[in-house]
Amino acid sequence: MSTLQDLSKVLSRKQAILEESAAGVEQQKKSGKQAARERIALLLDGGSFVEQSMLAQDAGVVAGSGTVDGRPVYVFAQDFAVMDGAMGAKQAKKIVKILEQARKTGTPVVAMCDSNGARVGEGAAALEAYADVFAHMARLS
């Protein structure tokens, strides 16, 4: 496969994620809530958000970095539009990645939580995911 074909595949996946998210955003608005990306946009300086791991399917969290009043921050917002924002292994992996980057750089983290809890279908792995996230958060406190 060529680089151009690979790029096309990535862009198609990104578009599919945004379209899936749009349906969930409408449901959020009906509930009187803002979507994850909207909450991040309201917090950060305009145009400063750099999303990380966007193509992680069904993670249920939007994560990245940006600035608040010109100061760098890492941020993550659970996305209730994806599996009610429930925490599982994929979501924890994205969050832990952000927390580790913040620890290495001494940069603050803003967490926007909107979740129904753990992904019970993942069983003990979901609880382990929570434990991993909370352990990393405790190290940053």
Language model: regions and residue ranges:
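Terminal-region recognition feature
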Residues: 1-141
